[in-house]
Every structure is written in C-alpha cells, then in structure tokens.
Amino acid sequence: MALDVQSDIVAYDAPKKDLYEIGEMPPLGHVPKEMYAWAIRRERHGEPDQAMQIEVVETPSIDSHEVLVLVMAAGVNYNGIWAGLGVPVSPFDGHKQPYHIAGSDASGIVWAVGDKVKRWKVGDEVVIHCNQDDGDDEECNGGDPMFSPTQRIWGYETPDGSFAQFTRVQAQQLMKRPKHLTWEEAACYTLTLATAYRMLFGHKPHDLKPGQNVLVWGASGGLGSYAIQLINTAGANAIGVISEEDKRDFVMGLGAKGVINRKDFKCWGQLPKVNSPEYNEWLKEARKFGKAIWDITGKGINVDMVFEHPGEATFPVSSLVVKKGGMVVICAGTTGFNCTFDVRYMWMHQKRLQGSHFANLKQASAANQLMIERRLDPCMSEVFPWAEIPAAHTKMYRNQHKPGNMAVLVQAPRTGLRTFADVLEAGRKA
C-alpha cells in the first residue's frame, strides 16, 4: 500500500489508536484496526431500526487499485432500505459476507491509496460515485461499463458502503468534491444526480434535446429534483408530478414549466383487464391526466420522455401519455415491480421502454461538473446525526421525508463545515 501523505492539509496532532470514536480524527493517513459501522446482518432483515445496528468491525484493507476514504458525511437512498429489508433481494445472496454496510453516497478524505493509484493522494477531498466493475472486459474498455457482467453498486451489492468511519472504494469511483458545498451537501447528491443524468442523456437517440418535454414523476424527491434541474439546464421543459400540494412551489422553484398533482386523478395501480368496464374508467381518467399535461405543453403536444421510477402505480399511464416514438425511461419500482401497460399503444405508436441503472464514470463526472460549476443545487432537505441513520431511512421508507435529499453526518462533527480544517477546529471546540 502506497501512503503518499503529501497534501494541502495543515499538520495536526492526534494519537495513533486502534479505534476512534465517531468524530475523532486519526493522524492523517493512519488506518486504525477497527471502526464503527452501521451493520446489517441477514438474521436482522427488516425495517431500518431492526436491520441496522452499530458494530465495531475491521477497517477494510485495500488492494493496489483501491482507496480508503475517511467518510465525513453520507447520503440516504432507497437502496439502504432494500438492503435492510432483504427485498427485492438480500445483499448477502450476492457478496456472501457476514455483515453488510449500506450507503452509496459519501463525501470524505482520501486516507490511504493502493500502489497502482495515480490520480489521487492522501488528503484529497472527494465525493464517491457508486459504480464498480472489474475493468477487464470489452464493456469496460470501449463499451459502457454499466453493461459489464461485473458491474455492481457499491454499498448495495458490495458489503462496504458509506455508513462507517471508513469505506473502501475503487480509485475510479472518486470525483472532486465541490468546494463551495458543505460536507453534508456534497454527500447527498451523487447517486441520484448521476442516475437522473444517465436517464435523460444516456440512451441515444432518445437523449434529451432543447425544447423537448419531459414528464417527471416524484418531482419533489431526490431523483425528481435533479431531473427538473437537468431538464431546465438543457433548455427543455419539465412537467413535474407531485402528490402533495405543498410541494408545488418547491418544484416550480427548481425550474419546472408546470406541475400536476396526481391526487386529482384516479388512474393509478396495475392496468385493469383491457376493454373491461374498469379499463374504460381507467382510460377516461388517464386521458384527463393527459389533458392536464396539454394544459402545460399545448393542446395535442404529448411528452417526448417520461422519467419513471415509481413503477407499478404509474407505469400504465406513463406508457399511454408519452408521444409516438417517445421513450419511457425507468430506474426503479418504488411502488411495486409488477408494471403493466396496454401494449397496443406501445407497438402502434412505436414507443420505447428503456431500463436505466445508475451511470458510468463519464456520465457521473459530467453531472458532478455541473455541481462544481454551481449550475445545480444539491437540494439537501434534512441532515441527521450519526446516531439517527436508521431513523433517516425509516422516514424515507414511510414517505415522511421533506422534498429533496437527506444526508447523515459520520466523521463531520456538525453541519455547515466545508474543509478539513473546519472539521479539526470544530473537533477542538467540542
């Protein structure tokens, strides 16, 4: 392991120990034998308060192309809930390890680097994108790494995510941290932003173009809030769908052309049997929803793209309202996985159904650059202390979270800090 400790960080005094308390800083580059982590075990599968428990575990070792990052803050995503529940699959079925540390977003400090790592050094401030691969197949070398047979999501399909004092990542996962953001702001956006970026720009020829119209489900949530901003930045028009009227101003403030409250309509859930009385009633309501879109886009102008992630509850409507030759792009199924649709509208109107999963490094970096250039807002809604990581996930699971993205503090002792020096100073005053 190479330990290049030349950095811009001012020297500070700290004892060398085998375990540090949360918020306590080791000497730069010193890797303790153990660390605190919120661990999930197979026998605890269930809701977050049951599944996630604090444990003292071994600090991960790294190989030649890996990096150890001291985690300042982490983001809260739905895959942490899935990992805890063991639904739709248990992470243990994949990585076979005795415990699982969730967390697929983080900001932090490079703490140790493998001897083949050239682009990063100890002391660098970074954010982490969550795609990993083995790097040795044709998709990783000239294709799209997201299609690699070894592609996996760090913190969900790997056991060593960000809800711990240290995390092990591949060097290619690291990106520069936007210096104008706090540690917690920098920790909350990478997974959702990069996912939204690929959905909108990653599936040619249906990549988003200026002037096009996009329907965005869950427009006030973490994923939707970035979709609205990216669509607006690209010179296209976002039509946001909300479920609570008090979220309208938030979505319009992000740059949406218009907002629709889905509770004004009754066409949700699985598609009724085609041509049944229930189907006819569903179609009448779905067309009312389509007319609400026209109130924003203009009469007869259907959306070019539907930004899908609820899945089961909304998919029948999504596949109906997208225009001829348009695309429904979907990255999740937060309301259920049994997606139904009337295939007649699909083949006759030659619509595209496109699955989308996170992003490759080029896409994640392009999205991150927009954040560095201050073209996007991280839309951080709430920050939780280390001790409340399960509570943050429970809030998301029960759909009680505020509009935007949630973050949790790990080694950062409080909110509002922007540099490592800030962290050290806050630690001395604590």
From Swiss-Prot:
Family: Belongs to the zinc-containing alcohol dehydrogenase family. Crotonyl-CoA carboxylase/reductase subfamily.
Cofactor: how and how many bound: Despite some sequence similarity to zinc-containing alcohol dehydrogenases, this enzyme does not bind any metals.
Matches recorded under SMART domains: PKS_ER
Gene3D superfamilies listed in its UniProt record: Medium-chain alcohol dehydrogenases, catalytic domain, NAD(P)-binding Rossmann-like Domain
Origin species: Cereibacter sphaeroides (strain ATCC 17023 / DSM 158 / JCM 6121 / CCUG 31486 / LMG 2827 / NBRC 12203 / NCIMB 8253 / ATH 2.4.1.) (Rhodobacter sphaeroides)
Function per UniProt: Catalyzes the NADPH-dependent reductive carboxylation of crotonyl-CoA ((2E)-butenoyl-CoA) to (2S)-ethylmalonyl-CoA, in the presence of CO2. This is a key reaction in the ethylmalonyl-CoA pathway for acetyl-CoA assimilation required for R.sphaeroides growth on acetate as sole carbon source. Is also able to accept acryloyl-CoA as an alternative substrate, yielding (2S)-methylmalonyl-CoA. To a lesser extent, when CO2 is absent, the enzyme also catalyzes the reduction of crotonyl-CoA to butanoyl-CoA.
Entry keyword Oxidoreductase: yes
EC numbers, comma separated: 1.3.1.85
pH dependence: Optimum pH is 7.5-8.0.
Keywords: NADP, Oxidoreductase
Keyword Cell wall biogenesis/degradation in annotation: no
Taxonomic placement: Bacteria, Pseudomonadati, Pseudomonadota, Alphaproteobacteria, Rhodobacterales
Induction data: Down-regulated in cells grown photoheterotrophically with succinate.
Domain of life: Bacteria
Protein name: Crotonyl-CoA carboxylase/reductase
A family per Pfam: ADH_zinc_N
Phenotype upon loss of function: No effect during photoheterotrophic (anaerobic/light) growth on succinate or 3-hydroxypropionate, no growth on acetate under the same conditions.
